[in-house]
Amino acid sequence: MYCTHLRMLQLVVMATLWVTPVRAGTHCRYGCRLNNMTITVEREDCHGSITITTCAGLCETTDLNYQSTWLPRSQGACNFKEWSYEEVYLEGCPPGANPFFIPVAKSCDCIKCKTDNTDCDRISMATPSCVVNPLEM
């Protein structure tokens, strides 16, 4: 009888641990999402700062301890799902200056990391996770 209850408890704990990371990811503050960012733009005739909407955040990544041909590694990168170019004029530009055309994110998604246009390096283990919010420390 005792062994049966112990076995059942082990199964419940294992099931809980299996589901926990999936549920934690859906409420993570560091997940892939739209984010406002201020950048500096310049050219010969003018320069200044603008605020754009871009994608930022962490994506789930699978990195196995062993190499396998039937279990591929996948590394997601937070990137634009839908975007468009917006015309931006800077205050410091002379009258009649050509505008800047800036890509602006409309929605974001975790997609397979494309090394031709994305930095796919791993993030340091010192990076805050969903469990620890640096603002609450």
Curated annotation (Swiss-Prot):
> Where is the protein found, in the record's own terms?
Secreted
Which residues, renumbered to this chain, are glycosylated?
36
Cellular-component GO terms for this entry: cytoplasm; extracellular space
User: InterPro entries annotated for this entry?
Assistant: Cystine-knot_cytokine (IPR029034), Glyco_hormone_CN (IPR006208), Gonadotropin_bsu (IPR001545), Gonadotropin_bsu_CS (IPR018245)
Disulfide-bonded cysteines = 32-78, 46-93, 55-108, 59-110, 113-120
Q: Which SUPFAM superfamilies match?
A: Cystine-knot cytokines
One GO process term, biological-process aspect = ovulation
Out of the domains of life, which is the source?
A: Eukaryota
CDD domains (alphabetical): GHB_like
Subunit relationships: Heterodimer of an alpha and a beta chain.
Known role: Involved in gametogenesis and steroidogenesis.
Name of this chain's protein: Gonadotropin subunit beta-1
Q: Which gene encodes it?
A: cgba
